[in-house]
Every structure is written in C-alpha cells, then in structure tokens.
Amino acid sequence: GVEFRQGETSIYSEYLKYNREFGRLEAEGGVRFEQGSDRFFGSRLRYDTTDDTGVLEAPAFLMRRKQTARGGAERLEFLGRNRLRLSGAHFTTCEPGNDDWRLEARQLDLDYEEEEGVARGARLRFFDTTILGAPYFSFPLENRRKSGLLAPQFAQSTLRGAEVGLPFYWNIAPE
C-alpha cells in the first residue's frame, strides 16, 4: 500500500497519484482517509489538499467529535475542512454494532463550522421502521441550542411494549 501525510491528514490506499504542483491527489483501492479524529473509508478518492475539497466514492465514516457519528453513503463530498455533503446517506450516533435508530437521506450536509446538519429527502428509522419522513429538516451537530426535533428516545417495557419518543425543543431565547 501507499501512504500520504500532510498536517493532520493521512491517506492510505493501494494506489495513489499526487500532483505536488497543484496539490491534487487520486487514490484507489481500500482508501482510508484520516483527518484529525475523523475516519473515512471508500473505494476511490479525488482530493485537493490546497482547499480540502474532494470526492470519496462508496464511503463509510466514523467521526469522533463532541458526539461520535458514523454511517455511509453512495458518495461523500469534502466541501472544505469542516463541511461534508453525503449523497444516498445513512447516519447514526449509536455505538458500532447497534443500529437502533438511523437517519437516511437523499442528501445530508454536515457543517461543523456552523454546527448544523441538514437532511433532504430524509427518513428517521427505528429498528428498520420509518417513524418520520421529511423533505427537509435541520439539526444541531454539537451541544448548541436550536429549536427543532431532538434525538429520538426509545424504551421497552412489559406493560407498554415498545415506545418511541420524538421530543421537540423550543429555544425561546438564545441564552
């Protein structure tokens, strides 16, 4: 395999071509892209090191920020250091091996500069059952207050059976 390192970015793959003059690279075959505490895996990567933009095909990801998130997509676009766009995506904050809930979206934008996620053509699924569908909704990525739906809550009891709660938070004042 081949390894590329620059600052906090490391790329590993079977094949890698790098144009030093323009800062562009292409990698294929078992691509692993690491940036800070984020990990991305895919089949093919085109990336511009000068502005942190590029495309990763058939990605899986694990992002360890204030809240760990993981998922996959048909395609992932790097839109700068802290901005991602995923097409045909699924996303969860559940621990690996536990997919109790997940968000599926035709397009999922994650902007860690603004601490906001935006899902288009979205479905919120609980144990493979869609519990909410929305053409568009936004959600916070960090611990910032924002009016909107909160993470789903799940419970199981012998008295009531399975329960799903979808709380709504109304941020009346920014403080």
Residue ranges and their predicted role:
Residues 1-175:
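Structural signature for solvent-exposed beta-strand/loop edge elements and short helix-capping sites
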